[in-house]
């Protein structure tokens, strides 16, 4: 038996529609004390998932809104329990009055993520699907939303479950060989088991290989802006942000620390990192900023090397250029195209060179095209991209353990030694979907949800 929970699923801000969400044993009958159908029939008489008109009452029995409601009976609901939703006008006062009436009718306030936690505990979804719900809510691009939607539908589970189930079969055979040595059981075939485990390791490697793109789709491409002082780095950040995110002056060394801003560039979510101008300086604070600029260049997906194209290259420009070229991807940005040029594109050893003017905003379409070429949309965002660090960590541990099992087989070790590694791999892989559940992990996951989800 589960107690009855209720929450405002749409928050308490003024909106066109506000939703009261309910779940738990007996919640449909109890909700009928607060929401009464216009037909006069009890709420429990409705068929599942049919919106019907009625009136919402407060705890004193006064009508507070004319709205709609529907019910879903267990197990065919989001949580796997009896559920109901009351869809009101988005008045914070009406929603609060309705929620207080529900409390008086025996409901309690739902905790953050409790609806989805119940869905997980009742077998309506696994942990990858639960985490994808958060990713879908947080998605800032169409690609991120599409990938999260695919994972809500079970894309990761469909890749993980066959591997896990295959390991279960292998473990069962190993145990049979060990526990019943005198029985007529298929012999321990070294080559067959090795091939099976090697193939599962390959599949895990393929899944892990999607992590980089998955992270960029979900969290954004980390692009570090590098250049000498007054090249136009902060002006570039401000132009792409659409507002004055950082201070811009003619004084060298104005930017002394890294400044981050997330922007949308075409179909790409980009986390821009503005940095201090790279130069030799005696100023202690500015020197720390320059050091951080060099460190940021080592931890990025792309470097944007900004240079004042109206002046010849300086030693400071070349130092910044060297740092940019060490990044996984790099774009040279010839700024100040509104002035006579002093640098030819052929002077720069970059595959992608974009002439722009931060003053009049010319050339920014070319920058978007450069990102399209560097980060092509050549892999489907259907849920197959691994975006979650927790899941990736568990898969990596599983792969290391299964690789160790393969090495044990090749070394001619006995089945019991192989079992140790294989069962460790199963424990790790089971954490991905929740088949091997740790309460501290699930608590951490569902604490990320808002109330009402």
Language-model-derived ranges and their functions:
Residues 1-146, 150, 154, 331:
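A glycine-rich (often HGG/GG-containing) alpha/beta subdomain
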Residues 3-8, 12, 142-264, 281-283, ...:
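C-terminal-of-GTPase-core extension/linker across diverse P-loop GTPases
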Residues 52-64, 69-73, 253-281, 299:
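Switch I (G2) and immediately adjacent beta-strands of P-loop GTPase domains
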Residues 272, 306, 333:
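Generic enzyme active-site microenvironment
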Residues 286-310:
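Inter-motif core of Ras-like GTPase G domains
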């Amino acid at each position: 038996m589960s107690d009855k929970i209720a929450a405002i699923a749409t928050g308490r801000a003024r909106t066109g529609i506000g939703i009261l969400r309910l779940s738990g044993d007996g919640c449909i009958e109890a909700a009928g004390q607060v929401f009464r159908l216009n037909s006069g029939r009890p709420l429990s008489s409705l068929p599942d998932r049919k919106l019907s008109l009625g009136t919402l009452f407060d705890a004193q029995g006064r009508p507070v809104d004319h709205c709609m409601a529907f019910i879903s009976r267990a197990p065919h609901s989001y949580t796997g329990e009896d559920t109901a939703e009351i869809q009101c006008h988005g008045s914070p006062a009406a929603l609060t009055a309705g929620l207080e009436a529900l409390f008086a009718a025996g409901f309690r306030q739902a905790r953050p993520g409790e609806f989805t936690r119940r869905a997980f505990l009742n077998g309506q979804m696994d942990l990858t699907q639960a985490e994808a719900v958060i990713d879908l809510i947080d998605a800032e691009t169409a690609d991120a939303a599409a990938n999260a939607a695919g994972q809500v539908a079970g894309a990761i589970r469909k890749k993980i479950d066959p591997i896990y189930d295959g390991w279960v079969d292998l473990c069962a055979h190993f145990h049979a060989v060990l526990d019943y040595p005198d029985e007529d059981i298929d012999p321990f075939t070294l080559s067959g088991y090795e091939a099976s485990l090697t193939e599962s390791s390959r599949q895990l490697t393929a899944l892990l290989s999607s992590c980089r793109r998955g992270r960029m789709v979900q969290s954004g491409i980390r692009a570090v802006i590098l250049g000498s002082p007054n090249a136009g780095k902060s002006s570039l950040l401000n132009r792409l942000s659409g507002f004055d995110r950082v201070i811009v002056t003619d004084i060298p060394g104005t930017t002394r620390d890294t400044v981050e801003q997330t922007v949308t560039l075409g179909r790409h979510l980009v986390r821009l990192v503005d940095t201090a101008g790279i130069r030799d300086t005696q100023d202690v604070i500015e020197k720390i900023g320059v050091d951080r600029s060099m460190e940021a260049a080592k931890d990025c997906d792309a470097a944007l090397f900004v240079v004042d194209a109206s002046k010849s290259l300086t030693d400071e420009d070349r130092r910044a250029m060297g740092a940019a070229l060490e990044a996984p991807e790099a774009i040279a940005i010839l700024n100040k195209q509104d002035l006579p040029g002093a640098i030819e594109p052929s002077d720069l050893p970059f595959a992608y060179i974009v002439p722009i003017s931060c003053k009049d905003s010319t050339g920014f379409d070319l920058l978007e095209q450069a990102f399209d070429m560097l980060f092509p949309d050549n892999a489907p965002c259907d849920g197959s991209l691994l975006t979650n660090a927790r899941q990736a960590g568990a898969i990596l541990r599983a792969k290391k353990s299964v690789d160790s099992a393969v090495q044990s087989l090749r070394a001619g070790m006995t089945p019991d030694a192989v079992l140790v590694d294989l069962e460790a791999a199963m424990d790790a892989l089971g954490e991905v979907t929740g088949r091997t559940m740790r309460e501290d992990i699930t608590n951490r996951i569902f604490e990320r949800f808002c109330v009402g989800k």
